[in-house]
Amino acid sequence: MTNQAAEVAKRRTFAIISHPDAGKTTITEKLLLMGKAISVAGTVKSRKSDRHATSDWMEMEKQRGISITTSVMQFPYREHMINLLDTPGHEDFSEDTYRTLTAVDSALMVLDGGKGVEPRTIALMDVCRLRDTPIVSFINKLDRDIRDPIELLDEIEAVLKIKAAPITWPIGCYRDFKGVYHLTGDYIIVYTPGHGHERTEAKIIQKLDSDEARAHLGDQYDSFVDQLELVQGACHEFNQDEFINGQLTPVFFGTALGNFGVDHVLDAVVDWAPRPLGRVAHERTVEPVEEKFTGFVFKIQANMDPKHRDRIAFMRICSGKYEKGMKMRHVRLNKDLRIGDALTFFSSEREQLEEAFAGDIIGLHNHGTIQIGDTFTEGEALGFTGIPHFAPELFRRVRLKDPLKSKQLRQGLQQLAEEGATQVFFPERSNDIILGAVGVLQFDVVASRLKEEYKVECAYEPITVWSARWISCDDKKKLEEFQNKAMENLAIDGGGHLTYLAPTRVNLSLMEERWPDIKFRATREHH
């Protein structure tokens, strides 16, 4: 095996998906602790202050105490290199989260044992399903009262449409939580709470049918054995092929706060989750062990460092090897660049990088020329597929306070839209500018950044737009006919694409019925 192939085989790149408050931040901390990336878990604190977690860079995040940005963290574990992409928990930032999921090979789904499957989890699983992403599941908070575990598995299967295969099974919960039983290994992992950075070596009891197990379970023993028979009769067994194809999820139980069960999940990622996979480009499929470097940008983060008005483009390496000072081609601009200052991440602690391999995430300094979806190669003209723009759910008309600054306003909105969290639309029939976003908070972010970075003050007005759909049609004549009839509701988006701004849900349904040859798409790819 070549050195490059060996490095690729070591990589595991995954994201954590969950509903806000299911315990994602705590799990992230415990995972980093396993890789010794932080010495004291129980809070990813900034090294310079105790007030803010390291991943909260932007002023607005600090003021509101939510993670708006996607953090990327790399750490070693069991002779592997783990790339963990943390996704924003706040509901307004789903588009950023969705695109992050295009850069990973697997995902860890965290569920609150007391609440089960929640709306955000469903939305994120829908995105994972588009790419058949393998999912490992962790049912968290067993140190509290949880719902019946069998009921939770049924809910995963019914709501998320994926088979659930329990690997561990909880022995009691809350004050009676005694640990988990490993179904295939026939052993008990005893629960001893470890808080903060304590990692207590787990005590193992071999075989459920043993005096030691009977003593540990006490009067719960008989009912637990009965429950297990039911579970083993009713549940799916783990199957590696079904897992890799996104049809089955192995399920683990534990408590991240009590530092119990998180290592089982990380072991599953190392043992079962795929190494970096081939990536589909418009031209061909790119394999990770190819010699030549390729990568695509899935996220742009502006102003990670307020001292320099910088933007960092986050790139997933798809093949080859990044070496400091190498030359790469920015395919969309057909321009060669020498990259000597790519970054690796521990949240906002950034370090310059000497080398990186397929599966790794690196940061490129971006002075406004890099866009989401851009491909970089060593010369080949490639464009990776599957990096989506989603139709916004909220719309506002932008009103300029100083009419003389309309040029700066357009420029600012266009540049901020390039980061992919908001989208800008220019109606065909008016001089209005309409801003679309997936959450209300984004409008505040844009207004404050226009003011700080572009010296433009704007206000928002309500507008009757229910949703946007990108328009395409194979029949040119039909498209022209549609454009003439629907002109009132048509706009051009920031990327120059024709868009239908539907005033109501009913209007959209009627238009889709009336114009069967026109495709009304809720997503479009970045090009």
From Swiss-Prot:
Annotated source species: Pseudomonas entomophila (strain L48)
Main subcellular localisation: cytoplasm
PROSITE patterns cross-referenced by the UniProt entry: G_TR_1, G_TR_2
Name of the protein: Peptide chain release factor 3
CDD domains the UniProt entry points to: RF3, RF3_II, RF3_III
Signal peptide span: none
Binding, GTP: 18-25, 86-90, 140-143
Residues passing through the membrane, by range: none
Gene: prfC
